[in-house]
């Protein structure tokens, strides 16, 4: 059952009976997760070229090339060199790394440009071509901090509008922005990480992924409620998966006015019901 359905089930049948009947509770979240990106292996051209030490662009968005000859990594928040940023305030940030990843997974051709220095074994100094996900050796989504367990509500106490990664905040408490899947959220349904850990198989971006490690800034030692739910930012997941299996419906490049670009990521995590205690955690409500 889903993390929403289990709430009614527990209410109708009680914790003990529900724990006997339910094998797995499915959880999910879909939101902007800026510590996301993808690494690509393009294979070797003729003559060969070494990207490492040079510069690489995908649809004019810079990627990191400090690996071996033909490995690159593109981050969700990367911006083209010619983007005006906030010189025109608030900046629109119409296209960035998250949009490139969405277009890659959608099967669109991506303009790839690399410039570097030549060597005896890699004599080529420039490569400009179109790449497509179906032709690449590996394309892997690797997100170092996703599915944050809890987070702040953002408000603005000043007398002017401000533009943030939590959206546009109106002056004088004119609005309050937050981002959570509530009772569906994976780490709110397993607040002490009893079933979610390294190697957990998950739904990632419309395909299959895995929990690779704890996410950056993972901090389980926070104040919690009686139900285990943290009262501030706590746990996070680092996740990995084959981008070739994923779908653009679950990986969306987005723009935050006055702030920058991002990638919305869909994540689903199954929680095996091994005990009444674990079921009790999954009955958490909004």
Question: Where do the protein language model's features map onto the residues?
Answer:
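Anaerobic metallocofactor- and corrinoid-dependent redox/one-carbon enzyme cores
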Residues: 2-286
